[in-house]
């Protein structure tokens, strides 16, 4: 028989974080919640109190009153494929596009991409997206490709291919998310025990970070604001909570598949890259008659970051001096090849720090990254998933 009454309180390993998308801000949807993998969380509520500066002859401060009640949301994570797609989409104000799901034995490889004799087979593919191709006998035709042009019967890619007749069973897949204007909020719950829950309605994500560093797996965090924190004794999910994806976390070795700048591989050795997404100006809205938030200001999407390389030449430094906007993109995948291509179509390198930190050390160059809306594409960041 197992021993009982051994614990002084709730253990962190028993805490489950789950969520559902809201149709109406702050209102719990009648759907199954989804569990989230996480390495730490910081969901919490707080009250703002104020007291008048009254002049009193008893030399005591006047009692305080509650003026606002707030709640904050936070998740730290190790990046794994598919786990945070909803949260990332909410942060960027958009949805991933309908997945490209093309397959068949009627797809041929060409020196510049792919062709088919089947009319309309490639109509779901558009210029600019990244796709994952598999099934060809020639390895040059498989892998991750950036589409530069597409029609119903042909796809042109930035990466060279090889002439290969149709015949093998080939699959082409991908889905794209860009920053948009849609507002998406979530209903989160923190399960502490079978009858102990904390609930965070109206959660709106206002910031996120993804970091790759030598010797580490991909890490990240999301931060946001919630309408209020309240307690509950029952599960808010309609039915059982859906389990989180179980894929392996993305590592910084095979899981990092190169950084491109201006559509060419960066020749320098990369030591680390960080991207920060923020909704500047996002805030809860308050009014008379209630301490709780009455609405949300969405803010505007900004993308910043940094990249650190082993210094060897002035190739990137020259773009900093000229303030030339370039396309930046990198890919991260798990051991099954599932993952993301993260792209800034109009990025600037700024404020490099090229320093000799001490004897016997590598000279590193750290550049700040600044994303801007692309003049013709109209977005600041794109995330393709495979």
Where are these regions (language model features)?
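Signature of extracytoplasmic/envelope-associated structural regions
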Residues: 1-386
């Amino acid at each position: 028989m197992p021993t009982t009454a051994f614990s002084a309180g709730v253990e962190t390993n028993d805490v489950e974080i789950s969520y559902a998308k809201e149709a109406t801000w702050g209102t719990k949807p009648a759907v199954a919640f989804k569990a989230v993998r996480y390495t730490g969380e910081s969901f919490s509520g707080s009250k703002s109190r104020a007291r008048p500066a009254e002049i009193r002859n008893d030399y005591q401060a006047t009692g305080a009153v509650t003026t606002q009640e707030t709640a904050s949301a936070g998740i730290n994570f190790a990046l794994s494929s598919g786990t945070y797609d909803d949260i990332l989409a909410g942060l960027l104000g958009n949805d991933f596009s309908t997945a490209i799901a093309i397959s068949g034995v009627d797809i041929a490889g060409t020196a510049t991409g792919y062709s088919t004799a089947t009319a309309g087979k490639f109509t779901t593919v558009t210029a600019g997206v990244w796709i994952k191709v598999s099934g060809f006998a020639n390895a040059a035709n498989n892998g991750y490709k950036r589409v530069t042009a597409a029609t119903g019967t042909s796809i042109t890619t930035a990466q060279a291919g090889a002439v290969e007749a149709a015949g093998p069973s080939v699959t082409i897949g991908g889905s794209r998310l860009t920053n948009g204007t849609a507002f998406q909020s979530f209903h989160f719950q923190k399960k502490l025990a079978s009858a102990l829950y904390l609930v965070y309605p109206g959660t709106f994500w206002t910031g996120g970070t993804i970091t790759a560093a030598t010797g580490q797996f991909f890490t990240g965090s999301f931060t946001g604001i919630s309408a209020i924190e309240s307690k509950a004794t029952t599960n808010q999910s309609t039915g059982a909570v859906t389990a989180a994806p179980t894929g392996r976390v993305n590592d910084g070795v095979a899981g990092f598949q190169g950084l491109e700048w201006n559509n060419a591989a960066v020749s320098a050795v990369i030591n680390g890259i960080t991207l920060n997404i923020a909704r500047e100006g996002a805030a809860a809205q308050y009014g008379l008659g209630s301490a709780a938030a009455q609405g949300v200001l969405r803010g505007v999407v900004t993308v910043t970051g940094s990249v650190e390389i082993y210094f060897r030449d002035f190739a990137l430094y020259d773009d900093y001096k000229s303030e030339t906007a370039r396309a930046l993109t990198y890919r991260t995948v798990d051991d099954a090849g599932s993952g993301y291509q993260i792209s800034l179509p109009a990025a600037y390198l700024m404020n490099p720090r090229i320093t000799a930190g001490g004897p016997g050390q590598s000279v590193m160059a750290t550049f700040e990254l600044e994303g801007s809306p692309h003049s013709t594409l109209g977005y600041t960041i794109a995330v393709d998933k495979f």
